[in-house]
């Protein structure tokens, strides 16, 4: 479509899953003749939690946990209806959150 692009944002806790899914999207889009910009790795969001190890005493003894959220961004330019059909039929991993916007 003219002057429109599809922006795809991927979010996952495992970097291997997100890279594999991004590669599948790029291959599918290029197979239909679209131009793909990306995947661009965005900064990893790190959430840290401190939890008491003991339920009663020893407040100084704590467990430190963290969750890392990995993000990737892709733009698909010069896409056709074939591209959208192929992307809709694409089956990605369950651990990857996909957000698609047409701009």
UniProtKB/Swiss-Prot annotation:
Gene Ontology molecular function terms on file: structural constituent of ribosome; tRNA binding
Which key words are in the record? Ribonucleoprotein, Ribosomal protein
Q: Which domain of life is it from?
A: Bacteria
| Pfam families given in the database record | Ribosomal_S10 (PF00338)
Give the CC-aspect GO terms: ribonucleoprotein complex; ribosome
GO terms, biological process: translation
InterPro entries, from UniProt?
Answer: Ribosomal_uS10, Ribosomal_uS10_CS, Ribosomal_uS10_dom, Ribosomal_uS10_dom_sf
Q: How does it assemble?
A: Part of the 30S ribosomal subunit.
Stated role: Involved in the binding of tRNA to the ribosomes.
Family per record: Belongs to the universal ribosomal protein uS10 family.
Query: What name goes with this protein?
Result: Small ribosomal subunit protein uS10
In which organism is this protein found?
Neisseria meningitidis serogroup C / serotype 2a (strain ATCC 700532 / DSM 15464 / FAM18)
Top-level taxonomy: Bacteria, Pseudomonadati, Pseudomonadota, Betaproteobacteria, Neisseriales
């Amino acid at each position: 479509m003219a002057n429109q692009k599809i922006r795809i944002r991927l979010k996952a806790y495992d970097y291997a899953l997100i890279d594999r899914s991004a590669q599948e999207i790029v291959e599918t889009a290029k197979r239909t003749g679209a131009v793909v910009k990306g995947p661009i790795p965005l900064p990893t969001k790190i959430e840290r939690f401190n939890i008491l190890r003991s339920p009663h005493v020893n407040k100084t003894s704590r467990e430190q946990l963290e969750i890392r959220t990995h993000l990737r961004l892709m733009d698909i330019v010069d896409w056709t209806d074939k591209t959208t059909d192929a992307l809709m039929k694409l089956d990605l991993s369950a651990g990857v959150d996909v957000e698609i916007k047409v701009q």
